Regions:
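Compact, glycine-rich, soluble single-domain proteins
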Residues: 6-97
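Acidic/glycine-rich phosphate/pyrophosphate-binding loops and surrounding catalytic core
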Residues: 81-129
Length: 129
């Protein structure tokens, strides 16, 4: 039995398909979804979504958002979604270093600090993908 997955951004449905197991980055850590999962609503963080179908593994880098889980599906509403295959590790490393340098000179609780922290989180997710 499979789990139907939808990853939706403000611009479009970035991915739709079925898998045996989906893992998503929750606020309290990664959570997995198998068929017959309990109904759940969760806040998600920037990170890596992993979809497993048999021996095939597909990964996406996603921004923060929400997950709605049902017995046979998961819908992720996120602000961005990129295929892990499209990630340029050198660019992600540069973005992470720039974000960390910027964080040293700003109030991390300010709006600017939170924006920079989000950039750092996305760069880290790209490097993990």
């Amino acid at each position: 039995m499979t789990v139907h997955v939808e990853i939706v951004t403000p611009m479009a449905v970035a991915y739709e398909g079925d898998c045996d197991m989906a893992a998503a980055p929750g606020q309290l850590g990664e959570f997995g979804v198998l068929n017959m999962h309990a109904h759940t609503l969760a806040v998600t963080e920037a990170g890596v979504v992993t979809l497993v179908s048999g021996s095939d593994v597909t990964k996406f880098v996603v921004g923060p958002g929400f997950a709605e889980v049902g017995p046979d599906r998961i819908t992720l509403l996120v602000d961005l979604c990129e295929s892990a295959d499209d990630v340029d590790k050198a660019t992600a490393t540069k973005e992470l270093n720039e974000a960390f340098a910027s964080l040293k000179s700003c109030d991390t609780e300010s709006e600017e600090g939170l924006r920079i922290r989000r950039q750092a989180d996305l760069a880290q997710a790209r490097l993990r993908a």
